[in-house]
């Protein structure tokens, strides 16, 4: 939403909490400097950020390997400028699926983006968002379904079924089906639902370029699998709500896993069975870490204590109710 704030031509301030404050914003700062757009930041370029002015139409360039959110932000804002603009993405491009979702959403609301290829876009100016269809179907979330599919595979006697999923979705995280199947999972697809049943897993190589949000829960699956799993091209996870690579390695190792950090990924030697558990672990104020550790608890011999469990509210407020519904057990401890 930063580019949208840079359309207002009045001071617009963005604030954040936790790790969000220190997430890199240099791609936007470079644009502001090039256009002479006044902005003020916190220490070392961190939030809060105040931008005062208005973006100008023209030629824009962004790196493709930092975050697709920078690209989506400009695609939302540039159509509202007075004249046409172009956007070039510098390779390598990661998380391309998220850009596809952005383009589809823009089209639904009357915005035209001319895409030459995955790296080049022409954005006509003087456009306006239109209400479009009175009713829009919101498809199921493969990112959230991934937690239950892993849970059904490693920690459920009766299996878990996720409904309302579109096999032809543009969501990159539908890769969970391919990855879990490659690891040996027993997945049954039927009429928009997927059922995951308990099955022994085997390690493999996982390229996280286009599905980084799957890494935390796939790390759990790999920790109890047989053999070695190598997660690669996942360096961007170090600048999410927390350093997710470090968080998952630290907390799962505390539960008895064997995980080594690498600059761009994780090397996981699976236990070929349950984790010992019985320890206190922390969610690092990160919703995906919290949900992944909850799934890990299903594959632990002893109960765990999870601090920061409330962080699931960022993306999945009903997670703990669903956790109980599929057979998980939890209780709140006052400390």
Write out the residue ranges for each language-model feature.
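Short, structured segments at the rim of ligand-binding sites
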Residues: 1-335
């Amino acid at each position: 939403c930063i580019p949208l704030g840079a359309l207002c031509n009045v001071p617009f301030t963005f604030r954040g909490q936790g790790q969000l404050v220190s997430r890199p914003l240099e791609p936007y700062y470079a644009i502001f400097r090039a256009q002479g757009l006044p902005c003020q930041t916190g220490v070392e370029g961190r939030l809060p950020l105040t931008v005062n002015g208005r973006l100008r139409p023209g030629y824009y360039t962004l790196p493709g390997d930092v975050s697709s959110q920078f690209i989506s932000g400009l695609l939302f804002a540039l159509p509202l400028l007075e004249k046409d603009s172009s956007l070039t993405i510098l390779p390598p491009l990661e998380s391309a699926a998220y850009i596809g979702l952005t383009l589809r959403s823009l089209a639904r609301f009357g915005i035209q983006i001319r895409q030459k290829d995955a790296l080049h876009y022409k954005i006509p100016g003087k456009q306006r968002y239109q209400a479009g269809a009175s009713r829009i179907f919101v498809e199921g979330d493969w990112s959230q379904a991934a937690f239950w599919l892993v849970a059904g595979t490693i920690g459920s006697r009766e299996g878990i079924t996720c409904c309302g999923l579109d096999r032809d979705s543009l969501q990159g995280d539908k890769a969970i089906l391919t990855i879990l199947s490659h690891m040996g999972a027993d997945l049954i697809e039927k009429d928009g639902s997927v059922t995951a049943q308990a099955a022994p897993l085997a390690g493999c190589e996982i390229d996280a370029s286009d599905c980084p949000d799957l890494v935390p829960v796939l790390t759990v699956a790999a920790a109890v699998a047989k053999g070695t799993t190598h997660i690669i091209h996942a360096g961007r996870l170090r600048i999410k709500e927390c350093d997710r690579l470090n968080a998952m390695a630290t907390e799962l190792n505390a539960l008895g896993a064997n995980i080594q950090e690498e600059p761009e990924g994780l090397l996981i030697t699976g236990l070929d069975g349950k984790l010992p558990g019985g320890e206190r672990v922390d969610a690092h104020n990160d919703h995906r870490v919290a949900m992944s550790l909850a799934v890990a608890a299903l594959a632990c011999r002893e109960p765990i204590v999870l601090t920061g469990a409330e962080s699931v509210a960022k993306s999945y407020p009903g997670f703990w109710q669903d956790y109980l519904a599929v057979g998980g057990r939890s209780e709140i401890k006052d400390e």
